[in-house]
């Protein structure tokens, strides 16, 4: 054992400088420090375990007693000890604990706690002497090497006294650590307390699905709901097209003559409402006076009595929304949206389930017109009338027809006024009729270059309406209508004298019939007319009609001489050219008179 004051004794000690510095911080009032004297030498030479450091002594004690610095195993291990010796031993154990913490910081190893049966109860008593508030944790930070203090007790060195301390309850700590794992996912279909659970088609409040019009999706407004996950639009798109919802996307329209269209980016369920349609409100007087030239994006707003209130014009893109690019359907076969007026707004409602990638095409339905008591009838233009010069003049000259019936003739009806509706050259030839007088309008003539003739329908299935047997083919220049496409191809339009021969498939026109015939060959691969009996497809409506007669047995072409009937006109002409085949009924051997 080293003797106190031995000059060579320090050569045998390997003490970390950080360890000495820590002891100097614990005992700043000890002159040269606790290492002077026999107490320090005995403490360093004895293989005593290291324990965390205790709190600093009170200010009135300038220097701790020398006996309290030296652990005495004999006195500590004795079972009978006085209260004074117990308190002294507790402070000694705390000093050893402080030395252990400093040694851990300096890189020195300490003995395990299980090998210290004597110091364990004393350390537990020291910890129990400073209880913490229940269910609270203290988080402290210090900038110096002193120990981190928790609670309201006195700090260690000068650096430890000014350190910030944070408190949080055990419930808060448990919520931030494990609260996300206990989150409960609530399905959306459990929310049944919506006050607007209403079917607007039949104007009835319901608690569930409407049995007539399907699920209730009237609150699913797609306008203005932008998608952050959607792909960035091309930079050349205007601002009003960059805020598309995630359910739709911009596409090339299938309607001839129109550039853009809106298609479904995902499956849109039947009954989904899209809207409201945004635009500029126009009084009826302004529209009827001819101030609006483009009526393609014009919708009407009626009151409960069926009186026209105003128009909503979406022709100006900066004051409208992306809904203006939802095009009008040309026939019922391609229609998937219907126009619905709810209060003073226009909405589009999905009448069928729209698959992904299908273009959205809108038009009226029967419930829209029956709600206001406005009859929806098929109209056709009388070919004997003069050629109209404007769109409104052509619409006003049309006569209302009764639903077409093969077994009866068309009944004459009175001429009625047609209200302005969104019209495109390829839109379906329907109009809403009103009982008031005719409208005088000054609409300018539509540019012929932007017109496209209504070519063959995209679907050959018959329309599921009372007008399924009445197909109209309309000239894009003079608006004359024909029942067959071949008649439209043979039609010579007077609006363009230089190029009167117009193709029935596209908008091209030619000056000579031979040029038109050569051009029609390019459309020969298109066979939109399909037979419902055998499934064969044909390029023209006349060819299909001739083929259908082979299934039905109808022979409308009858020879006047021999009264034989044929299914096609070519068969009749060939029969009449044959001299030995066509024999009149009156020419018989019994009826021949001989002079």
From Swiss-Prot:
- Impact after mutating residue 263 to S: In PDA3; uncertain significance
Query: Which Gene Ontology molecular function entries are recorded, alphabetically?
Result: histone H4K20 monomethyltransferase activity; identical protein binding; zinc ion binding
Family matches, as Pfam families: PRDM2_PR, zf-C2H2
Protein name (database record) = Putative histone-lysine N-methyltransferase PRDM6
The catalytic activity of this protein is classed by the Enzyme Commission as 2.1.1.361
Q: Zn finger regions (C2H2-type) covering which residues?
A: 473-495, 501-523, 529-551, 557-579
Catalytic activities: L-lysyl(20)-[histone H4] + S-adenosyl-L-methionine = N(6)-methyl-L-lysyl(20)-[histone H4] + S-adenosyl-L-homocysteine + H(+)
Which disease appears in this protein's record? Patent ductus arteriosus 3: A congenital heart defect characterized by the persistent opening of fetal ductus arteriosus that fails to close after birth. Fetal ductus arteriosus connects the pulmonary artery to the descending aorta, allowing unoxygenated blood to bypass the lung and flow to the placenta. Normally, the ductus occludes shortly after birth.
List the biased-composition ranges (Low complexity).
Answer: 71-90
- Which EC class, in a word? transferase
């Amino acid at each position: 054992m080293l003797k106190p004051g031995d000059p060579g004794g320090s050569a045998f000690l390997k003490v970390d400088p950080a360890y000495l510095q820590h002891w100097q911080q614990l005992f700043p009032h000890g002159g040269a420090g606790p290492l002077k004297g026999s107490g320090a030498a005995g403490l360093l030479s004895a293989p005593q375990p290291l324990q965390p450091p205790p709190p600093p002594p009170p200010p009135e004690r300038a220097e701790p007693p020398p006996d309290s610095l030296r652990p005495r195993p004999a006195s500590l291990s004795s079972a009978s000890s006085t209260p004074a010796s117990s308190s002294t031993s507790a402070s000694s154990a705390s000093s050893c604990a402080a030395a252990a913490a400093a040694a851990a910081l300096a890189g020195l190893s300490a003995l395990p706690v299980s090998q210290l049966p004597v110091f364990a109860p004393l350390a537990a008593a020291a910890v129990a002497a400073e209880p913490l508030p229940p269910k609270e944790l203290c988080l402290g930070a210090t900038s110096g090497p002193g120990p981190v203090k928790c609670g309201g007790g006195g700090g260690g060195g000068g650096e430890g006294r000014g350190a910030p301390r944070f408190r949080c309850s055990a419930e808060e700590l448990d919520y931030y650590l494990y609260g996300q794992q206990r989150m409960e996912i609530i399905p959306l279909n459990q929310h049944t307390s919506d006050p607007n659970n209403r079917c607007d088609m039949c104007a009835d409040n319901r608690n569930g699905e409407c049995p007539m019009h399907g699920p209730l999706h009237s609150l699913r407004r797609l306008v203005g709901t932008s998608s952050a996950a959607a792909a960035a639009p091309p930079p050349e798109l205007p601002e009003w097209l960059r805020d598309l919802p995630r359910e739709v996307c911009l596409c090339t329209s299938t309607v001839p003559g129109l550039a853009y269209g809106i298609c479904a980016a995902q499956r849109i369920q039947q009954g989904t409402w899209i809207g409201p349609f945004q635009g500029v409100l126009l009084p009826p007087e302004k529209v009827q006076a001819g101030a609006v030239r483009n009526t393609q994006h014009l919708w009407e707003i009626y009151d409960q009595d069926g009186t026209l209130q105003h128009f909503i014009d979406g022709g100006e893109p900066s004051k409208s929304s992306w809904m203006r690019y939802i095009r009008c359907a040309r026939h019922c076969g391609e229609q998937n949206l219907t126009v619905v007026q709810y209060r003073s707004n226009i909405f589009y409602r999905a009448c069928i389930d729209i698959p992904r990638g299908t273009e959205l095409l809108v038009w009226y339905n029967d419930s829209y017109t029956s709600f206001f008591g406005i009859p929806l009838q098929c109209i056709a233009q009388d070919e004997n009338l003069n050629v109209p010069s404007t769109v409104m003049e052509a619409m006003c000259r049309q006569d209302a027809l009764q639903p077409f019936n093969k077994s009866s003739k068309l009944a004459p009806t009175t001429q009625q006024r047609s209200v302005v509706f969104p019209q495109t050259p390829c839109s379906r030839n329907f109009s809403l009729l009103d009982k008031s007088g005719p409208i005088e309008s000054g609409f300018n003539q539509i540019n012929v270059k932007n017109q496209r003739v209504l070519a063959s329908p995209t679907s050959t299935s018959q329309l599921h309406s009372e007008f399924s047997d009445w197909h109209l083919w309309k000239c894009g220049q003079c608006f004359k209508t024909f029942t067959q496409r071949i008649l439209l191809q043979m039609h010579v339009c007077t609006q363009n004298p230089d190029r009167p021969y117009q193709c029935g498939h596209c908008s091209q026109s030619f000056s000579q019939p031979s040029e038109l015939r050569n051009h029609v060959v390019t459309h020969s691969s298109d066979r939109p007319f399909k037979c419902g009996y055998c499934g064969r497809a044909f390029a023209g409506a006349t060819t299909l009609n001739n083929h259908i007669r082979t299934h039905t047995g109808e022979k409308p072409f009858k020879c006047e001489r021999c009264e034989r009937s044929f299914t096609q006109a070519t068969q009749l002409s060939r029969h009449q050219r044959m001299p030995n085949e066509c024999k009149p009924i009156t020419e018989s051997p019994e009826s021949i008179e001989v002079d």
